[in-house]
Amino acid sequence: MTTDELKSIFQSYCCKDGDSPGKKLFGLEYENFVMIPKVDDTTKTFEPLQVEGDKGVFRILENLADLTKEDNDPLEKVYEKGMLLALKRPSGAKITIEPGGQIELSDAPRNSLSESNESLQNYLRLLKKAVAEFDGE
């Protein structure tokens, strides 16, 4: 495979055309583990939030959806076989739970790094509110 062929494959997969010819958009994916204080631990150490249960990552999806239900671009719940697996916004962003329990934001395509940064900062502020009941970080 030549360098030009490899570049062409990369560009066709990673670069989607925007509203105007020659304009490219890009999307951010951001994964993180939510860490909570260990119970009865005086050393102030943290452990990953459980995947299931009342204090699990799926509860965070519920919290995120509740926090945005009055927004212009709310996070809508996505179920599979009766189980909440993800959230999605009408604008194209998605929040999923990855196999290791990490939470992933797959942001909608953006025009600039500034737009991506603003979106990421908004997501992190929202996530901080969603994990507040767990004393999470």
Where are these regions (language model features)?
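Terminal catalytic/cofactor-binding subdomain
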Residues: 1-137
